[in-house]
Design a protein with these regions (language model features):
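Nucleotide-sugar donor-binding and catalytic loop/hinge architecture
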Residues: 1, 199-205
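N-terminal subdomain of nucleotide-sugar transferases
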Residues: 1-43, 68-70, 88, 95-98
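Short N-terminal targeting/anchoring amphipathic segment
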Residues: 5, 66-84, 97-107
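Histidine-centered beta-alpha loop that forms part of the nucleotide-sugar donor binding/catalytic region
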Residues: 8, 103-106, 113, 127, ...
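A short, charged, and often flexible helix/loop element on the N-terminal side
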Residues: 39-64, 77-79, 136-150
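Membrane-proximal helix-turn-helix segments that form the acceptor-binding/catalytic region
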Residues: 61, 65, 94, 107-110, ...
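A short beta-strand/loop micro-motif in the catalytic core of glycosyltransferases
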Residues: 100-101, 163-173
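Carbohydrate-associated surface elements
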Residues: 174, 195
């Protein structure tokens, strides 16, 4: 099976936790499948970021290039929101491949992403529309928070997100429950915990 893994580029130099999970998955999958990883960089410049939140034509073209290059049977996305946009999910679905996204956090339902506000756990937007995050400026300020809120709201309420993705992988029962309570189809969300590297080699006395 040909599998294409897509990760949204980050703005930091050090690998993130998601990057570590992706490499671990790649090592496991390559034992039985042909797997390729591609990174799509976040857009540069405020205007490109804002106008590409809902639908990025640049990222749509980039993903189509990778689809033509690898002809995958499965496209597995990791970070999609906010900057890759629904356009990449649509491109993958349109190609005929099965589309999977790993839910590492709550970015589709919590504009902060990690269910935190003011340094404390917050679940006010779980099961709701997410407007509380705008009121509290959970992402930088009210303007940015509103933009992120609208992306998530449109993606879920229009059903585009659920129509474009065949299966969501939640990294924990908590993440799955939060998304199902927020409108994700329960039948589409499965739990696969992150793998943990364990060294079983005993030290010699």
């Amino acid at each position: 099976m040909n599998i294409l893994i897509i990760q949204g580029g980050s703005n930091h130099d050090l690998p993130s936790g998601e990057d570590t999970v992706i490499l671990s998955d790649w090592e496991n999958l390559t034992k039985e499948h042909n797997v390729n990883i591609e990174y799509i960089e976040n857009p540069k410049g405020a205007l490109k970021k804002i106008f590409g939140l809902v639908w990025s034509f640049d990222n749509y073209a980039r993903l189509n290039f990778f689809l033509d290059k690898y002809s995958p049977d499965v496209v597995h996305f990791h970070t999609v929101t906010p900057y890759l946009s629904l356009s990449v999910l649509y491109a993958a679905k349109k190609s005929g491949a099965r589309v999977v996204q790993t839910l590492h956090n709550g970015r589709w339902i919590c504009i902060e992403g990690g269910f935190f506000r003011d340094g404390m756990y917050c679940d006010r937007c779980i099961g709701g529309c997410g407007v509380y995050g705008v009121i509290k400026s959970c992402k930088y300020n009210k303007t940015v928070s509103f933009c992120f809120f609208m992306v998530n709201f449109v993606a879920r309420k229009s059903m585009m997100l659920f129509n474009f993705v065949d299966k969501f992988i939640a990294v924990s029962e908590f993440v799955r429950d939060a998304h199902v309570r927020s409108g994700f189809p329960a039948s589409k969300v499965v739990v696969i915990n992150n793998s943990v590297g364990v060294n079983l080699k005993k030290d010699k006395d």
